[in-house]
Amino acid sequence: MTNKKTIYIWDGGVFSPPTKAVGKLAFNLATYISSKHDDKVNVEYHFVPTNKYYNKPWVRCVEEEDRLFMLKYLVEYINREYKVPSNIKFIVNDHDINYGKKTKDPSTTLTSLKYFTKKQMENVYLANSIDNVIQRVKGYWQDTLELFFKVRIICYDIYSPELIGVNQTENYIYKSINLVDLLQQEKHNYPVEFQQYFKKHKLSKDDINHFISSKKNEHKFEGLKKLIMSRLTFLPKHLVPEAYKAVAGNRVREELDVYYSSLKNIQDLTTPGIETYITDKGLYEHCKSKYVDKLISKSSKSRSKSRSNARSRTKSSAKSNAKTRSKSKSISKSRSNHKKTKRR
């Protein structure tokens, strides 16, 4: 690579195992981003496997070193099968795995991105499927606005036309944006772009609070959706491989978990190097059945203990209430239970 501006694509995931479709998609994402800059930039595509504290059985039942090896085979496959331009480089990045070794916890996206300097962050694209982007803009995940305005998002649509229609990706995401929840998450610590918008449209802190509580003057906030959309770049649908489905990795794991002696689907979905590596080491055999109930993350354990303690307190309270009711018949039977509310 020559001494040109570098664009970074950050692709975090399980990659357990990585498939041919993952390789094809990565190649298409990298070449598309390069073309958006007239191929006058360097592009580094980083495959970033999650560490073993990520709460999924197919992460816990395969060693981190095995997933790193399989990704290295995938990079070799990409470089061998496709005409990779000299300005594009594919990298297997063990940043999150090293983070897990230090903290014994999974990493958030924002924590992972600390791999880059502040200057480099201006040139980072986070590779996300439409499903992940929708969950973010609906406010299901924390720190969405901070993330969207620290880096850019390259979004690829894995939905079928039957589900959302033809050429509806951008419209579908736009209509999914939940401004109330996104603003509420930030607690007035908004990105600079939002602060400038509020100042330009003379929207005070009270105006924002009224919008959050009752959607008052909703039309005045509509422009924020356009600011969010401006942070998204969309991979053209024809560049998303037909074989790329959210269940592709699951299909490989199911074949290995249940029908280990039948290798046809494994050969079709993975590269020769990965297929041989998996079968030689006997990876994934009975993976889900062995590991589905095991938690590793200390934060997950903490949450689990909290839920357990809460259940114990609830049971004790219920028994106590039952005794009280049996002793005192004057207490009204119509007393309603406390209403339970949950926010995702």
Predicted regions span which residues?
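Nucleotidyltransferase catalytic core that binds NTPs
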Residues: 1-299, 343-344
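Compositionally biased low-complexity segments enriched in polar/charged residues
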Residues: 1-4, 198, 287-344
